[in-house]
Amino acid sequence: MSRYSRIAGTGGYLPRQVVTNDDLAMRVETSDEWIVERTGIRRRHIAAADETASSMAEIASRQALEAAAIDPHDLDLIILATSSPDRVFPSTACLLQQRLGVRSCAAFDVQAACSGFIFALSIADQYISAGNANRVLVVGTEVNSRSVDWDDRSTCILFGDGAGAVVLESATEPGIMSTHIHSDGHYQDLLYLPNPASNGEGSDESRTIRMQGSEVFKVAVNTLGRIVDETLEQNGLQKSDVDWLVPHQANIRIIAATAKKLQLPMERVVVTVDEQGNTSSASIPLAFDEAVRDGRIKRGQTVLMEAFGGGFAWGSALLRY
């Protein structure tokens, strides 16, 4: 009998502190109108001093586990995507495991920048399909605010903090229909966060996110268009078969371009970038959780998730919820 994975539960967490565009305009030369026109972002959530990637992940994970009616001790695997880990090592997944009081399963991190959740979901799906796991917790969690240069208007306007999670469980019919992941390291210098501990990258200036925005935008739009075609073709589906697009929340113009490629009206696209900014690997599970909980996404509907980020790394997941 074939084995598949399905999403059994979702969860999400956003910090209480909110920074608006007007707040940023008091610090750098910008305005609410300028930011909204170029990005679609109006506000973003910022982690408190005592919040970390693992603490936010715990809240989102407990919500997802409760929604799935699964005890943490019944998990076979924890996969956590982040570019802002609590520590270089051990993995933030291990720290989350400790917070959940679990000892019996493996736990590890995935680092694929803004595409991290898709990469983690793909790995989890493979574990379940191969019969090596029955229940997997997949998390995206980020504290981007601690890697942002708050005096650089090109990046400080973009990023927010938060965590999202899903529980995957084995099923006899496809939930996850396919996943597709790709990377091309030749673009590494267009979007990156240096490691201060690495040789030659230890200056104070290099401890913040660096991005060549216009170049990233061009590649992202073209690349996401191609992965939409790849995903539909592999599954023998037409654009009209997709009920919902849940994209990485980087920029409303990129999101709109992908929706246009799918011939989807924006009413069938889950958009959170206006209220949350770019939460990197957390953005897709946060958006998915919101749309599930408010009733927009219903059981049996077909959902396309897609993401693009530093590396470059990009990917998609097609699923029947």
From Swiss-Prot:
Recorded GO MF terms: 3-oxoacyl-[acyl-carrier-protein] synthase activity; beta-ketoacyl-acyl-carrier-protein synthase III activity
GO CC field: cytoplasm
EC number: 2.3.1.180
Keyword Cell inner membrane assigned: no
Keywords: Acyltransferase, Cytoplasm, Fatty acid biosynthesis, Fatty acid metabolism, Lipid biosynthesis, Lipid metabolism, Multifunctional enzyme, Transferase
InterPro entries per the UniProt record, alphabetical: ACP_syn_III_C, ACP_syn_III_N, FabH, Thiolase-like
Self-association and partners: Homodimer.
PANTHER family: 3-OXOACYL-[ACYL-CARRIER-PROTEIN] SYNTHASE, BETA-KETOACYL-[ACYL-CARRIER-PROTEIN] SYNTHASE III, CHLOROPLASTIC
Family: Belongs to the thiolase-like superfamily. FabH family.
UniProt function note: Catalyzes the condensation reaction of fatty acid synthesis by the addition to an acyl acceptor of two carbons from malonyl-ACP. Catalyzes the first condensation reaction which initiates fatty acid synthesis and may therefore play a role in governing the total rate of fatty acid production. Possesses both acetoacetyl-ACP synthase and acetyl transacylase activities. Its substrate specificity determines the biosynthesis of branched-chain and/or straight-chain of fatty acids.
Domain remark text: The last Arg residue of the ACP-binding site is essential for the weak association between ACP/AcpP and FabH.
Protein name, entry field: Beta-ketoacyl-[acyl-carrier-protein] synthase III
Organism: Methylococcus capsulatus (strain ATCC 33009 / NCIMB 11132 / Bath)
Phylogenetic classification of the source organism: Bacteria, Pseudomonadati, Pseudomonadota, Gammaproteobacteria, Methylococcales
